[in-house]
A protein has these predicted regions:
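Core AdoMet radical
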Residues: 97-114, 118-220
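Short, charged N-terminal helix-start/capping segments
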Residues: 11-17, 23, 86-97, 205-220
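Canonical Radical SAM [4Fe-4S] cluster-binding loop centered on the CxxxCxxC motif
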Residues: 71, 75-110
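Generic secondary-structure signature for well-ordered alpha-helical cores
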Residues: 30-33, 37, 64-71, 95, ...
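Surface-exposed loop/turn and secondary-structure junction residues enriched for glycine/proline
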Residues: 49-50, 58, 79, 83-85, ...
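Hydrophobic alpha-helical segments
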Residues: 59, 63, 75, 87, ...
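Flexible, acidic/Gly-rich N-terminal and inter-domain linker regions that tether
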Residues: 1-77, 88
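Short beta->alpha linker loops
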Residues: 61, 81, 162-163
Length: 220
């Protein structure tokens, strides 16, 4: 499997920064007339300071693309927090293990009760959230939570620490629909200052997974 870090290393980010600084209004007009950016340089031009005079055309174009793919739909989901147990130390996160806070993992039967209450409020899509802790947040626990929530929320995603493909399989079998993974920064020096202990401290391990929402069956 090709890690994202390997692909990222091939991107000439500083070149794109320079292209954004050097772009012209004529170039931005050309890109807008074409319909959408065709290259990374085009995208850099559209987020450049020179493009500030074209915010309304950009907004209208973005609106057309959004409606083309999703229609006039707003999908709401409710986060359901399963556990704040975590073995990582991350400077920005409330779950960080060095934070002096009470730790709790919600029992599965209480998770079911919470899902039922959210369904009564109209939510049909849930995001199950937990910190990274192999003892308290195991595959079996999360899979059981998914099963208990399904009668009340047919669309369930999870926000957990990145795992290998086989570890996601029980979540798929339980009825999970998607997974959300965040990469806080791709700037290595900044990453190291933000993640000081735990598995997440290792950059290659964090970069080997795609960033953002993806289907839970992405591994086949």
């Amino acid at each position: 499997m090709t890690h994202f870090s390997q692909y990222f290393a091939t991107l000439a980010i500083q070149d794109s920064v320079q292209q954004a600084q050097d772009t012209s209004k004529k170039n931005i007009q050309r890109i807008l007339a074409h319909g959408r950016p065709q290259t990374l340089a085009d995208f850099a031009a559209l987020i450049s300071p020179e493009a500030s005079d074209y915010l309304e055309p950009l907004a209208q174009h973005s609106r057309r693309i959004t409606q083309q793919h999703f229609g006039k739909t707003i999908r709401l989901f409710a986060p359901l927090y399963l556990s704040n147990e975590c073995i990582n130390i991350c400077r920005y996160c409330g779950f960080s293990r060095n934070n002096p806070i009470p730790r709790h993992t919600v029992p599965v039967d209480q998770v079911r009760t919470e899902a039922q209450k959210l369904a009564q409020q109209g939510f049909r899509s849930l995001l199950l959230v937990a910190g990274e802790h192999p003892k308290h947040v195991s595959n079996g626990y999360v899979a059981n939570c998914i099963r208990e929530c399904l009668p009340y929320a047919p669309s369930i995603q999870v926000e957990l620490a990145p795992m290998e493909t086989p570890d996601y399989e029980p979540l798929v079998e339980a009825g999970g629909e998607g997974v959300v993974v965040y990469q806080e920064t791709y700037h290595e020096a900044t990453y190291r200052t933000l993640h000081t202990a735990g598995p997440k401290k290792t950059i290659p391990g964090a970069w080997m997974h795609p960033s953002g929402p993806m289907p839970l069956d992405f591994g086949g």
